[in-house]
Amino acid sequence: MQGKIIKGIAGFYYVYAEDGNTYECRAKGIFLKDKFKPLVGDDVDITVLDGKELEGSVTEIHKRKNSLIRPAVANVDQALVIFAMDNPKPNFMLLDRFLIMMERENVPAVICFNKKDLATEEELEFLYETYRSCGYQVIMSSALKGEGLGEIEEVLKGKTTVVAGPSGVGKSSLTNSLQEEVEMETGEISRKLKRGKHTTRHAQIIPVAQD
């Protein structure tokens, strides 16, 4: 039976299969032996081991059109790279590294600067024009005030999008604002270090902006 890995946690892979069910699967040992790890987004074949408990085994991984290391995902159409305007302050060298990584894997990137309410109009305009002139679509948003969500929804429609960015920039808050099916844990900013604390520890496919 064919399906797609929609979540991976601690060696378990949750596969949404063609029969409409989601199976909790382990990967066959041959993948581990060959050091080829299944990724969220992989199209796979599974063998159903227990139809009642919805348990199975991943037996084959189909050819990938692309894959990323951080976050570890495969077969994405685009990336939404999220950075905050402040709290934490944007690390532009890190942003450039994210963009280079996406370019290397031929994954189109859209840049989202969240927490726009913490910046001046001059700062917003400067970053908008800087990255637009490099050919990137740029979205200014505020998860707190609900600004920019409509523009993000339009970008996400009909595409498998990987959300990337450092901790504390509002990735989970924006995801929660765009859908109600899954509640992502959100974290606080360290007052001492002015950095975000890791809250999202696994990759997962979440339906957003469906027609």
Model-based region annotation:
Residues 65, 180-211:
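Switch I (effector-binding) loop of TRAFAC-class P-loop GTPase G-domains
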